[in-house]
């Protein structure tokens, strides 16, 4: 029986997994290479919580919609509520308006409705030149406080400066080698971003995307969070957060003046009335980090078979999947590839993993687990003939 679980990664993916599992009675050890939680893409000071909507027909099976509702419910819990500022979010209409969102949407006039530019301006406290979708329950999370609260669960032990160097299966347990020593676990959850010396995720494709936010000294009497492709938050701790750049395959995390300028230009283009209110960029702060995405932009969450990639090289592609021997390995799970949506989506990923560990039915449609299945890319490559090599070609 699973008693002790090691989670690698102390960003929102790992911290939410740890909390959900600890809440179900497991002892959880979280290992992270950094000296504090949220050192990667989860470490921006504020994280915006809002959904990207789809039409009424697709909503019941839409990951982001379901994740948004689930996250809002969790954030009402007292220990989390203090880290959530429910400012509401105005999603400004773009040139390509959201035709799918209208009175037929199941959330209409309850969780979302449309405001004309005058009403949107009154809601925001600043002049806006276009209509917007209004999400009254949305807002932003103060990330540091939330991560620390998640990791403070009585069943969670967080170990920092613990870079994981490898993991091997020994009978029914994992033995994890880190710079803070060895750890044994009945199950292992990998929830770290990007590359690692652990080979257990070979075949799971991730792409880095650099993003830089700008922190602007308080200058705007903004009451709500504005989204327009980028975003602008009300002042918090003396700064507005403006974000964010999007630079695929850029691995550097230095703060760049041109990225500040990009954020300023996007803000001025979408909210012209605020352009002249911005303080000089010399007063701006910033943070750059890497967000990791999958090819289909859905995260990977659930059980992963690290032997699958090699096993499929022995089988030519065909319509139906081959029957493979069950790997003699302890359980391995992943929660990775959340991109910029981790603070909304990671909770659902954590629940999916916990449900698989405990063999508990999921409250969400079966299609969600299939959409997030980590091994979907390996099977896809096999079906497309990218894995199999005839024996004579192997020498």
Model-derived segments and their meaning:
Residues 6, 13-24, 33, 41-48, ...:
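Active-site substrate-recognition segment that forms the wall
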Residues 46-124, 129:
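Dinucleotide-binding Rossmann-like beta1-alpha1 core, especially the glycine-rich loop
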Residues 56-67, 92-98, 133-149, 254-259, ...:
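Short beta-strand to alpha-helix junction loop
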Residues 279-395:
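C-terminal catalytic lobe of FAD-dependent flavoproteins
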Residues 29:
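Conserved beta-strand positions in the Rossmann-like core of class I SAM-dependent methyltransferases
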Residues 24-26, 153:
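Conserved dinucleotide-binding and phosphotransfer motif residues
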Residues 133-187, 191-192, 196:
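Helical element adjacent to the flavin cofactor pocket in flavoenzyme catalytic cores
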């Amino acid at each position: 029986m699973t008693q002790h679980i090691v989670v690698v990664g102390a960003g929102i993916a790992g911290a939410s997994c740890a909390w959900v599992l600890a809440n179900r009675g497991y002892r959880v050890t979280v290992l992270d290479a950094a000296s504090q939680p949220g050192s990667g893409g989860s470490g921006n000071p504020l994280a915006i919580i809002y959904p990207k909507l789809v039409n009424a027909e697709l909503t019941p099976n839409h990951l982001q919609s379901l994740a948004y509702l689930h996250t809002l419910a969790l954030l009402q819990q007292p220990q989390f509520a203090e880290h959530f500022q429910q400012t509401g979010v105005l999603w400004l209409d773009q040139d390509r308006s959201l035709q799918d969102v209208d009175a037929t949407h199941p959330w209409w006039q309850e969780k979302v409705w449309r405001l004309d530019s005058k009403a949107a301006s009154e809601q925001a406290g600043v002049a806006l030149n276009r209509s917007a979708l209004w999400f009254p329950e949305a807002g932003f999370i103060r990330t540091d406080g939330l991560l620390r609260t998640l990791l403070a669960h009585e069943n969670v032990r967080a170990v920092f400066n613990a870079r994981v160097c490898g993991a091997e299966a020994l009978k029914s347990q994992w033995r994890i080698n880190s710079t803070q020593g060895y750890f044994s676990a009945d199950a292992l959850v990998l929830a770290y971003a990007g590359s690692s010396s652990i080979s257990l995720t070979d075949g799971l494709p991730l792409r880095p995307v650099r993003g830089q936010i700008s922190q602007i000294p308080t200058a705007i009497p903004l009451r709500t969070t504005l989204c327009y492709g980028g975003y602008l938050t009300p002042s918090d701790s003396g700064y507005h957060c403006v974000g964010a750049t999007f630079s695929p395959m850029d691995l550097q995390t230095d703060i760049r003046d041109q990225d500040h300028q990009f954020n300023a230009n996007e803000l001025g283009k979408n909210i012209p009335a605020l352009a002249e209110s911005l303080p000089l960029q010399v007063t701006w702060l910033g943070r750059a980090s890497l967000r990791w995405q999958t090819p289909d932009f859905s995260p990977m969450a659930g059980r992963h078979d690290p032997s699958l990639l090699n096993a499929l090289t022995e089988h030519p592609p065909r319509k139906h999947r081959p029957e493979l021997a069950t790997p003699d390995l302890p359980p391995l799970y992943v929660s990775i590839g959340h991109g910029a949506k981790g603070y909304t989506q990671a909770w659902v990923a954590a629940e999916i993993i916990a449900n698989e560990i405990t063999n508990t039915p999921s409250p969400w449609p079966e299609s969600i687990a299939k959409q997030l299945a980590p091994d979907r890319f390996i099977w896809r490559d096999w079906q497309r003939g990218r894995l199999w090599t005839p024996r004579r070609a192997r020498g």
